Amino acid sequence: MKKTRRILLYGFGPYRQFRDNITAKIIKSLAPRPGLKKVILPVRFHRGQFVNTLERSKPEIVLGLGQSSRRGVDVEAQAANRRRAHPADPPKRISPRGPARIKTTLALKVGRVAGKSRNAGDYVCNFSMYVMLDHIRRHDLRILYGFIHIPYDYEKKKASGLVTKILGRCQRINLKAQR
């Protein structure tokens, strides 16, 4: 019998001019499944909320979802050590002594449905990625981490289908081969 993977799926609530966040809608629309922990976090630069979510969930795999203003779905390849609350502000480092970039560790293959991005921006999506990946790295945790940006105006049913498909693939991942 196959072991059920512990998967943390997180997204975000409303922010700035957006009263709704497509990631919250997607997460709420997904049926419960064994091993899946679904979390919707507030959009804020608060390291503790991300670290605490990781520690409480004890996942084997983390899949983060972020809303974007891009034209298509993007799988993020790395997080950058930079953040800023407003586009006019100069960027600040997330971790003064941390690496400039940290690569994601979950190989997400979604075909032509999504592009590959090496720039997660410098807002809370990137912040969450960097904080979680840095925590995983510094504590030598055996957790695979991936992140997907979804356009705010993307069709919810289509996006939910994509996330459902990815979660199914996550259940079938050979964790030893991925690490």
Predicted regions and their residues:
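N-terminal catalytic or cofactor-binding beta/alpha core of small enzyme domains
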Residues: 1-123, 132-145, 151, 156-179
